[in-house]
Design a protein with these regions (language model features):
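ATPase nucleotide-binding head domains, primarily ABC-like/P-loop NTPase cores
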Residues: 29-32, 224, 294, 305, ...
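C-terminal tails and terminal domains of large nucleic-acid-associated
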Residues: 837, 841-879
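Charged catalytic and DNA/RNA-contacting regions of genome-maintenance
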Residues: 1-325, 341, 345-354, 358-450, ...
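Amphipathic heptad-repeat alpha-helical coiled-coil/stalk segments that mediate oligomerization
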Residues: 198-206, 213, 261-262, 368-443, ...
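Hydrophobic alpha-helical segments characteristic of transmembrane helices
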Residues: 337-340, 346, 364-367, 543-552, ...
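Active-site phosphate-binding and catalytic loops of NTP-dependent enzymes
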Residues: 81, 104-113, 245, 384-387, ...
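Extended active-site and interfacial segments that coordinate phosphate-rich ligands
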Residues: 32-51, 136-163, 484-515, 595-605, ...
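Alpha-helical heptad-repeat coiled-coil segments that mediate oligomerization/polymerization in large
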Residues: 528, 532-539
Length: 879
């Protein structure tokens, strides 16, 4: 046995080997030490022919799933080596084989997975300058493939799918991509596979064979060279780990990244699409607001909608039409919710069925779900529109499968397939016959008691007992003190220290009656159950199509319900480039606040004179909430959802970028400012004129002059249609940036309205035209509870600093790329020289002369502020 264990372990070196021995899975040597430590199990030893005992630990086979899941969540792979023949029939050592390898991306245990989230396994192939990306969820049978031509686009797909496991070729692993970040920060198990997985010659053959097509054209893969290799490698990996035909993976869906709105990882995090930034909880996210789904399939589909909004107007309008229909038919909508509620996870149930791991109770759950389908299809007849028609066409009520299960499986069966009592009476004649024999078994059991009494009386052995174990069956046990009274017709079966065990012809006959019929009945029920399960598995394509239709209905019913409950409006979708939101509200914040009413606000952006809105105002006033709500309303509209507003006219955007807040990235050694600049650089490099940018406090992570210079230059760059020209909401504390409204045609100033009451302020949360006249920082500090002594000192200091404001100097900065009429060159006597010092005037003639020589009309904003910074340092150094 140990020799076979070592041979098997050699084949699965990278796995923890669960080796079945009787009623336990045992681990040996280093595996035992690892499992003992990770799962806090007792480490024992076993004699294995070596000088020292082999370290060993084990878990009961009936509880193994829980232990396996804990190991997989810690990043381990687990190979399950099972007994594949009946130990009673084995000649010599019981035959064992690895029946499955469980990895983070191939785990199909429904108890350990989040039912509302897909469990994706991704394969990445890097060849030349392209990345092939194949992604599957083995629990649902979904299989996608695409290609991208940059690392940034690859990371966008990575963030969109959020896989739990990545397999890749060696060139990708060594390409410089931050593998450690994927493993540690993102929690993804990443491994490079041997080169044979990625052979070009076998790739095409693998795909054609699995999907039963004659050419790659039949799969839509003509232009996916890297994608073909990635898809084939992923299938090979699944064959190796799952040890089955993968009959639940029936369709490969190529897609172009241009089909969906692009949202990078930072923006997903900042907008809190599916989880909150700090707590990583669903509550408080956009998904939390929208998700009123009743099924696991619907919850997963809605999540995918939120993570990949559409950019195709026609597809968006199809979704809108169905939501409108469901809104208008409230009774139909509520009846659909009633019938959707009892439906189990059909996608994952059919995978368990095809993997032959579904138990009798899974089959009853499946049957109960199928009973809900006919009334749902009847209700679908009331819905109009192209999308509703398409759903109806793919909606199969599966009555034949439901009838099979109702006639064959007991309503309350055991979990184990080996416990019997699975098959209904009347389904199979032989089962019925053997069940009738069971009545005789009960009588036979009474006969055992009768036989025991009769033998005691006949032999005079008062402590004679009839007992049973799996090895010897039924036997008569007599203690040594009475063995001299044993009659000749007793046949000895076993000698113990203090007793003898015997068999008689009459007892043997009873044993055959009892055990033979029970074993035959259990075995027959097991065989029939497998046949029924296989019949269901043969219909996997029908079941998956219906499961997807159910998921779609669930999603649109949910979106319609949310729209009605929250007074959302139907947005107008177009390609005009205009975003015009009246009375917009933040979908999450309005649900979270309890005592206050949410203040709505308007947003207007276009591709001409209203391209950039510069928003000023104090902290806590609501700038970030306003900008996020605008982005979320656009995103919701492109999901197809209704939106929280009085009205909305949404010109489709291809990307949403946000740069909202930052913190030090200590793990990678990056400061707050470096994190901020990396995000800004990504936006400026990858945004287009059709993108929506949400920028909050650009430049705050460095000195005032540097920060203002960068913020100014960024606004200039974005506003220039030849460079970018994207629609932008730009919040800032640099009030000097409001000067750009008069210098750049596409820039407009807005601020958060504030009401002053003496030294106190009230945030009105309303966006109004114009720039803020001051920041109210001291008032905000007072609201936050800063000690009064500090507040009073701050007032003194701000009064001194206000005399040395740089605003007047900023007014005279030229704007890059503007007509000469926009530039202003001040006379020397117009310049307030006190601005060059924070607390006193400047009397140094050489500095004044240097200032006279500066030609402001030929300086960029960055040059001007750098010069100002240089002169200020000279003054400081002389004090």
């Amino acid at each position: 046995m140990m020799q076979h264990y070592l041979q098997t372990k050699e084949e699965y070196k990278d796995c923890i080997l669960f080796y079945r021995l009787g009623d336990f899975y045992e681990m040996f040597f280093e595996d035992a030490k690892t499992v003992s430590k990770e799962l806090e199990l007792t480490l024992t030893g076993k004699s294995c022919g070596l000088e020292e005992r082999a370290p060993m630990c084990g878990v009961p086979f009936h509880a193994a799933d829980g232990y396996i899941n804990r190991l997989v969540k810690k990043g381990y792979k687990v190979a399950i080596c099972e007994q594949v023949e009946d130990p009673k029939l084995a000649k010599g050592i019981v035959k064992r084989e690895v029946i499955r390898v469980v990895t983070p991306g191939t785990n199909i245990d429904m108890q350990s997975l989040d039912e509302a989230k897909n469990n994706y396994l991704m394969c990445i192939v890097y060849i030349g300058d392209k990345y092939g990306i194949a992604t599957t969820d083995v629990t649902t049978g979904d299989f996608f493939v695409t290609e991208v031509d940059s690392e940034r686009k690859l990371l966008d797909e990575l963030n969109r799918f959020s896989p739990t496991e990545i397999i890749c070729n060696e060139p990708f692993y060594m390409s410089g991509v931050d593998i450690d970040d994927m493993k540690e920060r993102m929690g993804i198990a990443v491994s490079a596979l041997d080169s044979w997985y990625f052979g070009d010659d076998l790739a095409k053959e693998t795909l054609l064979s699995h999907f039963h097509v004659q050419s790659l054209e039949g799969l839509g893969l003509m232009d996916y060279d890297c994608g073909v290799i990635a898809s084939a490698a992923l299938l090979k990996y699944l064959y190796e780990t799952q040890k089955n035909t993968l009959s639940n993976i029936l369709e490969l869906r190529p897609y172009s990244i241009g089909k969906y709105m692009i949202i990078d990882s930072s923006s997903r995090r900042n907008l809190e699409l599916v989880e909150t930034m700090r707590e990583k909880q669903k509550r408080g996210s956009l998904l939390w607001v929208l998700d009123k789904t009743k099924t696991a399939m619907g919850a997963r589909l809605l999540r995918s909608y939120v993570e990949q909004p559409l950019i195709d107007k026609t597809e968006i309008l199809k979704r809108q039409e169905l939501i409108t229909n469901l809104n208008d038919q409230e009774i139909t909508r509520e009846e659909l919710r009633e019938y959707l509620g009892p439906i189990y996870d059909l996608e994952r149930l059919i995978t368990r069925i095809t993997y032959q791991t579904a138990n009798p109770r899974d089959m009853i759950a499946f049957c109960n779900s199928l009973e809900m389908l006919p009334p749902i299809k009847t209700l679908l007849e009331d819905l109009k529109g192209e999308l509703a028609t398409g759903i109806r066409e793919h909606f199969d009520c599966l009555e034949d499968l439901c009838a099979l299960l109702k006639s064959s499986i007991n309503d309350d069966p055991p979990i184990s397939v080996r416990d019997g009592n699975i098959i209904k009476t009347g389904y199979n004649e032989e089962v019925d016959r053997l069940r009738n024999v069971s009545i005789c078994i009960i009588r036979a059991s009474k006969s055992l008691a009768d036989l025991e009494g009769k033998e005691r009386e006949k032999t005079g052995i008062k402590n004679l007992r009839i007992k049973y174990n799996k090895v010897f069956g039924y036997y008569l046990e007599v203690t040594n003190s009475f063995k001299d009274q044993v009659p000749d017709y007793y046949v000895r079966k076993q000698t113990l220290t203090n007793a003898e065990r015997y068999i008689t012809p009459e007892l043997k006959e009873l044993e055959d009656t009892i055990l033979g019929s029970q074993d035959r009945l259990v075995e027959l029920e097991y065989d029939l159950f497998r046949q029924i399960r296989d019949t269901i598995a043969d219909n996997v394509a029908r079941i998956q199509a219906t499961a997807r239709a159910v998921a779609q209905i669930d999603v649109f019913v949910s979106l319609a319900l949310v729209a009605g409950q929250n007074n959302y409006c139907k947005p107008k979708i177009n390609e005009s480039g205009v975003i015009d939101i009246k009375g917009g509200r933040h979908p999450v914040v309005e649900k979270m606040i309890v005592n206050d009413m949410f203040i709505d606000n308007d947003t207007y952006l276009d591709n001409h004179n209203n391209r950039i809105s510069i928003i000023t105002g104090p902290n806590m006033a609501g700038k970030s909430t306003y900008m996020r709500q605008s982005a979320l309303i656009v995103l919701m509209a492109q999901i197809g959802s209704f939106v929280p507003a009085e009205s909305a006219n949404i010109g489709i955007v291809d990307r949403i970028f946000t740069r909202v807040g930052a913190s030090d990235d200590l793990a990678s050694g990056q400061s707050t400012f470096m994190v901020e600049m990396n995000e800004v650089a990504n936006i400026l490099r990858n945004a287009t004129a059709n993108s929506l940018l949400i920028l909050d406090e650009i430049g705050r992570g460095t000195s005032t002059f540097d920060g203002l210079s960068i913020a100014w230059a960024v606004v200039e760059y974005i506003s220039n249609p030849k460079l970018l020209g994207a629609k932008t909401l730009f919040a800032t504390h640099y009030h000097e940036l409001t000067e750009l409204e008069g210098k750049l045609n596409s820039v407009n100033n807005y601020c958060i309205a504030v009401k002053e009451k003496g030294d106190d302020i009230v945030f009105l949360r309303k966006i109004v035209k114009g720039g803020a006249d001051k920041s109210y920082g001291i008032q905000v500090a007072k609201l936050a509870g800063i000690p009064e002594l500090v507040i009073n000192r701050a007032k003194d200091i701000v009064n001194q600093l206000s005399a040395n404001d740089i605003t007047e100097t900023v007014k005279n900065i030229s704007v890059e790329g503007q007509a000469s009429g926009k530039k202003k060159k001040p006379h020397l006597d117009e310049v307030d020289l006190t601005q060059m010092s924070l607390f006193d005037t400047v009397k140094d003639d050489d500095i004044i002369q240097e200032l006279r020589d500066v030609d402001i009309s030929h300086m960029t904003p960055m040059d001007a502020l750098n010069k100002l910074y240089e002169l200020q340092n000279k003054v400081k150094n002389r004090w």
